[in-house]
Amino acid sequence: MLKVLLVGSGAREHAIAEALCGAPDEDVELYAFMGNRNPGIIRLAEDYVVGDPTDVEAVARAAADWNVDFAVVGPEDPLAEGVADRLEEEGIPTFGPKRGPARIEWDKGFARELMEKYDIPGRPEFGIFEDPDEACDFIDELGKPVAVKPAGLTGGKGVKVVGDQLKNLDEAKEYVKEIFEEDIGGIPKVIIEEKCVGEEYTIQAYTDGEKVIPTPAVQDHPHAYEGDKGPITGGMGSYSCPDGLLPFITKEDYERSVEILERTVEAIKKETGEPYRGVLYGQFMLTAEGPVVIEFNCRYGDPEAMNILPIAEGDIVTLHASIAEGSMEGEIEFLEKATVCKYVVPEGYPESSEGEGDVIEVDEECIHRYDAVPYYASVNLDEDGKIRMTSSRALAIVGIGDELEQAEEAAESAIRECVSGERIRHRSDIGKHETVEKRVRRMKRIRGE
């Protein structure tokens, strides 16, 4: 029996908890340090604490009190605060990189400079600036659409692109000033990049800092509303395909992307002196020239974790424990199944608190009948047993099927028939044939096919 600490309380962490507790290779006793009372994790946990996951001392105390064998950290914020370093000081191996290697996410400037220094392919033209005037001059010099990125963590909502959230270069320059004036991201630095044109996708890879095991490619849908409209969110849903690729990605595109991840793992160790232990998440854009790195994350994606964990088979506990120890062992395979994840969110998400505090009713037996799986996110289990929403994403439903169409129907039916609430919504277009085909056609145009 292994005692495992799980840090975090979103749908991603619920999926991790289910994967660890349901794994055949090792019995697990789960302990959770959560930011909210996630009913799915509470049900699986032997014991739990509700607190601030970025309070590394509190996390370390809880881990020591429970005498855990190893820890798994879900979100990026605790990793950026050095929770893995602090747990290691207590003698607790941790799945999730120390603060130095985690810088690949919490400082976007570091990520770009690392790629440049070690000549890792997939770099757009970019500049890093600590002075807003210099950044604005660079935008003028480029004279073409740009992406404006705060250097620090913004919960996936800080990047703005000309032609999407920004109308023109003048608005880009206004946003640069706003980043410095409002301290967006918490680091007084901005990255300006040429706008890449193509289709975005994610590949997550397990690594102990030496070996790398890639997982199926996933496509996220960050826009709030159907048809890829509205503000950027933490992710409204995602899909994966039975062959581990996506309809617009070739095997060669996938392999080139994995090579970028492998070289990045190697570069992180050389640069920081610390091996990267955990999941390295690469967000790519497939362009006419091939894969370009949009950004790296230092943990499982949310929602992308929900596309790979339910179809993972093999030594899941051994894999996580051995990565935490620093020498990856265990076999992991992925079923040749399609997955579609759709998030149910409060009506006002992400711009207002409309729906916050409302009860959401979830019939789990009904969901399972549709070949779907529920993962609870930013909700709280009341003392009276009711599940109440916060202002963030509430519930992820993952449909699984032999083909993408089946998986999408499973997720959509489960939401429509098994989930209810007065002020909830979801994107029904995620994983639908028309949505995917639109992306395939666009990619063919870009590649001149």
From Swiss-Prot:
Catalytic activity: 5-phospho-beta-D-ribosylamine + glycine + ATP = N(1)-(5-phospho-beta-D-ribosyl)glycinamide + ADP + phosphate + H(+)
Descriptive protein name: Phosphoribosylamine--glycine ligase
Metabolic or biological pathway, per its Swiss-Prot or TrEMBL entry: Purine metabolism; IMP biosynthesis via de novo pathway; N(1)-(5-phospho-D-ribosyl)glycinamide from 5-phospho-alpha-D-ribose 1-diphosphate: step 2/2
Positions of Mg(2+) 2 binding: 295, 297
Organism of this sequence: Methanopyrus kandleri (strain AV19 / DSM 6324 / JCM 9639 / NBRC 100938)
Signal peptide (from-to): none
Binding-site positions, ATP: 139-202
UniProt entry keywords in alphabetical sequence: ATP-binding, Ligase, Magnesium, Manganese, Metal-binding, Nucleotide-binding, Purine biosynthesis
